[in-house]
Amino acid sequence: RGAESDHVLVLVDGVRMGSATAGLPALQDLPIDQIDRVEIVRGPRSSLWGSEAIGGVIQVFTRRNTGKVRPNVRIGVGSDSTREASAGNGGGIGRGWFGADVAYTRTDGFNACRGTGGDAANPFGAGCFTDEPDRDGYRNTSANLRGGYSFTDTLTLEANALRADGKSEFDGSYTNRSETVQQVLGTKLRYTPSDKVNLLLSLGRNDDKSDYFHDDVQSGYFQTRRYVASAQGDFTVAANQLLTAGIDWQDDRVESTTLFAVTRRDNLAGFVEYQGRFGAHQLQASVRNDDN
């Protein structure tokens, strides 16, 4: 649809994720073993989710263990000295449920680039402008905790914590290794007094940090810390007609070896959306106001 990767909002269990400086998250570091499903909304959704969603929304849901308590273990190997292992436990107990998982992935990789730093034939170099004939690997360590409890049939509390540490090696004259940290914390309180009313209060925090190195010497880093809160109500006003109203707030803070004129911003917004289905036709109308 002509949008770029930094035009898409990424949510992990409802919490906004991503770097305020790069404009997009490190999706490659999210642990696949701990993802239950991914939902994608294509097209502009800024009126509901804000300016980060002008190209769409990607919502990642981690696994929710509500059945019988059951441990799990998985081990795998592959080419390029790839090995991975994961273990976890979770399930439902009475009116509550819990889940805990850890995972580790490592591959020694291969030589990512055969470049030159400059010679008589090409004094400016070529490729990645350096000659590092080594294997460039990747490592990822992650942990995910989540749980919930239903106080009544209409009132439910959930909480989740996800952390993923990644290390990528590559060839480059300025940087040849990056280390990333992705952390998501969230809690939700849901109240559903009837099948026509759904109220949700959410709090969350996201930490995104990227460190860059050249031959084990740090060359720079970027860190974003984001706090979010929202209150939303969904109301079924008639058959196949839904009215959504809410407010959301976020506070972004940036630290880096690069000097920025502004290192903190906050945004308070209110929104209303109507969705209706009439036979083969759909109608959607929404409005949002942001104070940034």
Model-predicted regions and their roles:
Residues G2-E4, V12-G14, R42, T62-R64:
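Flexible glycine-/small-residue-rich
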Residues H7, V15-R42:
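Short acidic/polar hinge/loop motifs at secondary-structure boundaries
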Residues G148-D165, T180-N292:
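Face-selective signature of the C-terminal outer-membrane beta-barrel domain
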Residues R1-A3, D33, V41, D80, ...:
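A short, compositionally biased micro-patch
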Residues H7, D36-R37, G56, T62-V77, ...:
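Transmembrane beta-strand segments of Gram-negative outer membrane beta-barrel proteins
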Residues S46-S47, Q59, T66-K68, R74-G76, ...:
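Periplasmic-side early beta-strands and strand-to-turn transitions of outer-membrane beta-barrels
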Residues T21-L24, R70-N72, N111-R114, F170-S173, ...:
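Short acidic, glycine/proline-rich loop/turn micro-motifs
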Residues E4, R64-T66, G91-R95, D153, ...:
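A generic beta-sheet turn/junction motif
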